[in-house]
């Protein structure tokens, strides 16, 4: 399974990513081994996920979410 996810960082910012193993990726982010963007904003909290069978579909969705404004991402989080 392929997952697109949103993390809420300690400073309130949102980070969007893609993975095949949510648990391992969240642990990597919180241990400082994740994306550079999240390393200085620890801890992070998983606030939203979408699951896809197809990797291409997940990457396409990640691309679209990354281009959303903060307010649009907050609405997306609130919709689930």
Residue ranges and their predicted role:
Residues 1-80:
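GIY-YIG nuclease catalytic motif and its immediate N-terminal context
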């Amino acid at each position: 399974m392929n997952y697109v996810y949103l993390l809420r960082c300690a400073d309130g910012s949102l980070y969007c990513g893609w993975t095949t193993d949510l648990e391992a990726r969240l642990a990597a982010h919180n241990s400082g081994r994740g994306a550079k963007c999240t390393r200085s904003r620890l801890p992070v909290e998983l606030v939203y996920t979408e699951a896809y069978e197809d990797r291409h579909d997940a990457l396409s969705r990640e691309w679209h979410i990354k281009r959303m404004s903060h307010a649009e991402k907050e609405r997306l989080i609130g919709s689930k």
